[in-house]
Amino acid sequence: MADLKAFAEQLVNLTIKEVSELTEILKTEYGIELATSSSVATGVSTSVVEVREEKTSFDLILKGVGTNKLAIVKLVKELTGLGLKEAKGIVDNAPAPLKEGITRNEAETLKKSLEEAGAEIDIR
């Protein structure tokens, strides 16, 4: 079963060029008709293109607060613009989303600030 999963993972991660080469190998070495192999290749290459589109919107998730909870609450309040009660609610309910739909750069900057204060952060 593990071998099949590894094989499936390799297929999903093929580039368009590799799919084209695979199509040619299936045609020449195994006699699989071009129409059959090209429709398979088209389906695979469409999936590959969709999977490899770069993500532009990220969510910042507070996973844990460490030992300095008060500093994290203050920092969450400052970085999100929330009130003290709302910021404390997020910290108390970790894991919880801090900011959603932000850029990669903003997410990395906020993550660095929060981790320096002792928080455990995840970017999704």
Swiss-Prot record:
GO terms for biological process: translation. One of its GO terms (cellular component) is cytosolic large ribosomal subunit. Keywords: Ribonucleoprotein, Ribosomal protein. Gene3D superfamilies: 3.30.1390.10, Single helix bin (1.20.5.710). The keyword Ribosomal protein applies. Belongs to the bacterial ribosomal protein bL12 family. This is Large ribosomal subunit protein bL12. It comes from Azobacteroides pseudotrichonymphae genomovar. CFP2. The lineage of its organism: Bacteria, Pseudomonadati, Bacteroidota, Bacteroidia, Bacteroidales. The gene is rplL.
